[in-house]
Design a protein with these regions (language model features):
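Short loop/turn motifs at secondary-structure junctions and domain boundaries
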Residues: 57-62
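Acyl-donor (CoA/ACP) binding surface of acyl/acetyltransferases
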Residues: 1-33, 66-172
Length: 172
């Protein structure tokens, strides 16, 4: 995995050493209006990040690509992630509510998508999110995602109250 630098932030490959700072970010209650729940403890998060440092599933079928988002003040403000299988990826992201509405989430997801297309040969992307999370729906729509078909919802096991959004990528 590469470090991805932009003028507004840096995406750093996530490692266990990020756990302490990210625990504070992920303890932001506003994030969980539409998400499940915060990490139960710093130790739990550190263990999770250690596992994710392998960058792949035990059977080798999936690549786990996780980046933390660092702004120029050196503060971590969230993460972007992709679970990659040949040709496609499931993406997810979380951003501290203190940084919502500034275009940083959009920029970070866009930078990750560019990396996935250029260096991991990803051609299609999908994201599962809560239907009521309009901020996230709009972010994905601005990046070219659209609502998936009912058949795709079933295939990706989207649950009641969730929406599946898809995007077909083209190389620039």
């Amino acid at each position: 995995m590469r470090v991805i630098e932009t003028a507004r932030f840096t995406l750093e490959p996530q490692i266990a050493a990020h756990a302490e700072e990210m625990f504070a970010v992920l303890s932001d209650p506003a994030i969980y209006e539409y998400e499940n729940q915060p990490p139960s403890s710093l130790e739990w998060l550190r263990t999770r990040y250690t596992k994710l440092e392998t960058r792949c599933s035990a059977d080798g079928r999936e690549q786990w690509l996780n980046w933390v988002i660092r702004v120029p003040t050196s503060e971590l403000i969230g993460y972007v992630q992709a679970t990659v299988r040949p040709g496609h990826a499931a993406i997810a992201y979380e951003l501290s509510s203190a940084h919502w509405g500034r275009g940083l989430g959009h920029g970070a997801v866009k930078a990750m998508i560019s990396e996935l297309v250029e260096h991991y040969k990803v051609r299609s992307l999908f994201a599962v999110l809560k239907r009521d999370n309009l901020r996230s729906v709009r972010l994905l729509e601005r990046l070219g995602f659209s609502l998936a078909s009912p058949e795709q919802h079933v295939a990706h096991k989207a649950e009641v109250g969730e929406v599946l959004m898809c995007h077909e990528c083209r190389r620039a």
